């Protein structure tokens, strides 16, 4: 997919508009920026799991709420559907939380792992970058990292869910295969940075994760 100059301009306009809203401190303006049809319902503070047959998916501050699709316009609902299917195909349960204290995907994923009864979690940013993590690893380490969000497809997200479930069962699966495109980074770099800035606007430092229910 080609990223047009107009798409970049639109993203810049949205980012600048969000900055202006934050500066104004107006809750009315902030609430108006939320699109109808949020993907999740927030149901209270997240709790640490006790089931060893679960995988926790942690989404970024804007995922499914202020942003609705990845950098290549894979709908967030599709991403969650595929990951859920992958986990369930391995016979495991799934829980969702939202991390608002950071927009760094490594730390989002590590929070997922810490809240998961199995110790395995998946973290995903709104632009699509994804990490499979284990609670005993340091945040900047991981089990699998998927940094090139423009190359992640429906099939990839499903495979990520399956592998996370396999790790939770104590298996050592082969890493999820991904496409490799040396031009993806320069092609999408500006848009990726802008989308990350947009998500970072909704970070509330020192807040704890929220439990989510898929609508």
What are the residue ranges of the model-derived segments?
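Protein-protein interaction and targeting regions used for scaffolding, dimerization, and localization
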Residues: 1-37
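Structural signal for hydrophobic packing residues in well-ordered secondary-structure cores
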Residues: 12-23, 83-91, 116, 164-172
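Flexible, glycine/charged-enriched surface loops at secondary-structure junctions
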Residues: 21-29, 91-99, 172-182
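Glycine-rich, charged/polar anion/phosphate-binding loops
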Residues: 39-44, 106-109
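Glycine-rich phosphate/diphosphate-binding loop of Rossmann-like nucleotide-binding domains
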Residues: 43-91
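C-terminal binding/interaction regions
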Residues: 66, 71, 140-215
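Active-site rim loops that border cofactor/substrate pockets in soluble metabolic enzymes
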Residues: 80-113
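Glycine-rich phosphate-binding loop
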Residues: 103-140
């Amino acid at each position: 997919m080609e990223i047009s100059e107009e798409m970049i301009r639109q993203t810049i306009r949205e980012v600048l508009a969000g900055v202006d809203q934050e500066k104004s401190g107006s809750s009315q303006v902030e609430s108006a920026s939320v699109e109808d049809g949020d993907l999740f319902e927030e149901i209270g503070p997240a709790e640490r799991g006790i089931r060893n047959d679960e995988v926790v998916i942690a989404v970024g501050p804007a995922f499914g709420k202020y942003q609705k699709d990845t950098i290549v316009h894979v709908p967030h609902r599709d991403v969650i559907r595929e990951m859920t299917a992958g986990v369930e195909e391995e016979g495991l349960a799934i829980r969702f939380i939202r991390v608002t204290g950071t927009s760094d995907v490594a730390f989002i994923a590590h929070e997922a792992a810490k809240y998961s009864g199995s110790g395995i979690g998946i973290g995903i940013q709104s632009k699509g970058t994804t990490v499979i993590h284990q609670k005993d690893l340091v945040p900047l380490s991981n089990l699998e990292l998927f940094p090139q969000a423009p190359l992640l497809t429906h099939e990839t997200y499903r495979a990520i869910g399956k592998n996370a479930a396999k790790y939770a069962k104590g298996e050592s699966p082969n890493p999820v295969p991904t496409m490799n495109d040396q031009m993806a980074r320069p092609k999408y770099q500006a848009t990726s940075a802008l989308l990350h800035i947009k998500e970072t606007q909704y970070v509330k430092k020192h807040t704890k994760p929220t439990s989510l229910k898929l609508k």
